Design a protein with these regions (language model features):
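Positively charged, amphipathic and often flexible ligand-engagement surfaces
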Residues: 1-208
Length: 208
């Protein structure tokens, strides 16, 4: 959430300079494109990677706490919202942030979490055709996006895009995962959700 961002970055900074982790490039961080601060957080992460002389794994998501962020801002009487209030702004922000992450391959290992075919294809073209292993990866939730990523993972000779996809599967007790499940249902149950709209056989392709 927005109110935990700064303390999360403080912890990340300490981890990056932890002597026992020197030379290890497995430190990662998740950023949410619907946050208005996201591009500036990326600038900070690039600077941190430079200062700590390591390559950071950065997972870019669109964001799953929209309802709670809006509610918190209203309850606290904030002048504005920390997140974009229209989905189209988040979609544009995601691509802008993806471009920033791809621009520094020596410092950032981008991990693009999306189930949206438009977003995926845009990133594919932004990254260029000179792909090499370890340049970047896509990510999807376990149980979602398989039809899309079946066209991504695999050899070019087989008609695939030859790009890697990591499957994200949360693990824990039902008490821990219940809130996570509710957020996923809200996100993908929305009328504007790509996952929801693509399942509608009556929806014209032009509108999709």
């Amino acid at each position: 959430e927005a109110d935990r961002l700064e303390i999360s970055l403080d912890l990340l900074e300490k981890l990056c300079f932890e002597p026992e982790l020197a030379g290890w490039n497995g430190i990662g961080f998740v950023i949410q494109a619907y946050m208005k601060r996201c591009p500036f957080v990326i600038d900070y992460l690039i600077d941190l990677a430079t200062r700590s002389r390591r390559r950071l794994m950065i997972r870019l998501v669109k964001g799953a706490y929209w309802d709670s962020e809006i509610k918190r801002a209203q309850v606290e009487g904030l002048e504005g919202y920390p997140v974009y209030t229209r989905k189209v702004y988040t979609d544009v922000s995601y691509l802008a942030c993806a471009k920033k992450l791809l621009a520094v391959p020596n410092l950032i290992y981008p991990q693009f979490a999306t189930h949206n075919a438009h977003t995926l294809s845009a990133i594919y073209h932004l990254a260029g055709q000179n792909y090499y292993p370890g340049q970047y990866e896509f990510q999807c939730l376990h149980g979602m996006g398989e039809p899309l990523y079946e066209q991504v993972v695999g050899k070019v000779a087989d008609g695939k895009l030859n790009r890697p996809c990591r499957i994200y599967a949360p693990v824990g007790t039902h008490e821990t995962l219940l809130a996570y499940l509710v957020r996923r249902l809200l996100e993908n149950g929305a009328n504007t959700s790509f996952v929801n709209r693509i399942a509608d056989a009556t929806l014209p392709l032009d509108e999709l």
